[in-house]
Amino acid sequence: MFPGLVPMSRDRKPEVMDQPGLDPAEHDRALRGLRRINAISRCVPGLFQHLQAVAREAPGNRLSVLELACGGADTAIALAAIAKRRKLNWTIQACDLNPEAIHIARRNVLRQNSSVDLFVADALDPPETEIFDVVYCTLFVHHLDPADVVRLL
């Protein structure tokens, strides 16, 4: 499809923060690193624009959003802050498989007085009790086998 482009192979070894028994301080440090990557890549403004476009089409501009594999929830918290400043009728939830990540995310939510609701869940088995207008994930898909990527999408 793209002449001269060599397909890259994915290295799916577990990352430091995925190691069982990892010291919580190390986990927190790893999630802070991801927060820096998200800030540098400016993913929130672009994501917000897409969410806003979806919300414009929704009745009453209501929007329910779920972030999968949220880590420290910095993206969800930032989106919720923008929505709050603009007085948008959005509900944002975020989940992660790792209870320690959710613990760290809860601290972040409290520290920033955010409305993001957090829970522990597997991205490949999200809650079926709720329906979301938008489900997204960032910095996560590289962890999955190709078949699971298709299943997730």
Give the positions of each predicted feature:
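Conserved acidic residues
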Residues: D133
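N-terminal auxiliary segments of SAM/dcSAM-dependent transferases
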Residues: M1-P20
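Hydrophobic adenine-recognition pocket in adenosine-nucleotide-binding enzymes
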Residues: F140
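Short helix-loop-beta connector
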Residues: A55-S64
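Class I SAM-dependent methyltransferase Rossmann-like catalytic core
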Residues: V16-H50, V54-A55
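Class I SAM-dependent methyltransferase SAM/SAH-binding core
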Residues: L66-L68, G72-D125
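A short, conserved alpha-helix within the catalytic core of class I
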Residues: L144-L153
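A conserved beta-strand element that flanks and buttresses the S-adenosyl-L-methionine
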Residues: Y136
